[in-house]
Regions:
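Long, amphipathic alpha-helical coiled-coil segments characteristic
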Residues: 3-46, 141-190, 293
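Residues within HEAT/ARM-like alpha-solenoid scaffolds
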Residues: 17, 65, 163, 167, ...
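A structural signal for well-ordered alpha-helices, especially hydrophobic packing surfaces
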Residues: 20-23, 27-30, 34, 52-59, ...
Length: 293
């Protein structure tokens, strides 16, 4: 599978009845809530905990996350009188309805794109008083797929590779500073792209190559003004620098969340040429664009 829209309904079919019953029970417990009684809140939380447990046998990370956050919100309402508002229960009921609609949609053949749950997920998190989640929070592309090298991997020993990556990282950091401080953003983005493309050539192994090949697509899009620059994207650029440092220090472990975030922003564009287009085709991201915020 290359995108989250492909989904095996088998395991969900086995537990769908249990999920429906528990979600219905959670909604029923809250239907006539009087604004103060904590018993319905605890009952609804318990039913959502049952839903969360049942979901562990299916690959529905976003659905599980929304369920867990909604359960936590109910538990906090039961424990903290200042959080007991009818508006908050309304949010919970809409979250339950969104979960039911999403699961029903999957069973009816709707695309599996958990980004559709982002608006209600963000509202639940806000009701809890948490930091706003990243726009890519419910974006789950298949980061295990690998891109093919056009040239053989560079035959470098560890010391030579470290030196070369160190040089590329220094260039990236200079460009990142220009970009973040908006002093000469275009020059900064050009340096960042050149540095990432150099690391792409130096990357050892298929997994590292695929990540840096993808990151180069994002840098190209930034330089061309093909993706809106927001604070989340700036954070992603900073985390790319940290990933560069890890590689320079000899670690081949990839941060899956960073990979997802890079792909999320690459998916924003619809250009038919350039590295970004190659990345979107490789990961079939075009199919998800209509669900992006």
């Amino acid at each position: 599978m290359s995108v989250e829209m492909d989904f095996d309904l088998g395991p969900l079919t086995w537990i769908k009845g249990e999920l429906d019953n528990a979600l219905d029970a959670a909604g029923a417990a809250l239907a006539d809530w009087n604004g103060q009684d904590i018993t319905p809140l605890k009952a609804a939380a318990a039913h959502l905990h049952q839903v969360y447990g049942a979901l562990q046998i299916v690959d529905l990370q976003g659905v599980s996350l929304l369920t867990s956050e909604t359960e936590r919100l109910l538990s906090e309402m039961a424990e903290q009188v200042e959080k007991r508002h009818h508006e908050t229960v309304d949010t919970v009921l809409r979250a339950i309805a969104a979960l039911k609609a999403y699961l029903d949609g999957l069973m009816a053949g709707a695309p599996h794109a958990e980004l559709k749950l982002s608006p209600i997920y963000q509202e639940v998190v806000a009701r809890r008083g948490g930091e706003p989640p990243a726009p890519s929070e419910l974006f789950y592309p298949d980061t295990a797929t690998r891109a093919s090298r056009q040239e053989p991997e560079m035959p470098l020993d560890d010391a030579a590779r470290t030196r070369a990556i160190h040089g590329a990282r220094s260039q990236y950091q200079r460009g990142l500073l220009l970009f973040l401080q908006n002093r000469d953003a275009m020059a900064g983005l050009t340096q960042m792209e050149l540095a990432v493309r150099q690391v792409e050539r130096l990357a050892p192994g298929a997994a590292q190559f695929t990540f840096w090949w993808t990151a180069a697509g994002l840098m190209e899009m930034l330089r061309r003004g093909r993706v809106p620059t927001d604070n989340w994207l700036k954070r992603v650029c900073g985390r790319v620098d940290l990933q560069m440092r890890r590689l320079m220090e000899g670690s081949r472990q990839l941060a899956d969340r960073l990979f997802r975030d890079v792909l999320y922003y690459v998916a924003q564009d619809d250009a038919s040429e350039g590295r970004g287009a190659e990345v979107r085709q490789h990961f079939q991201l075009q199919r998800l664009r209509r669900f992006l915020q």
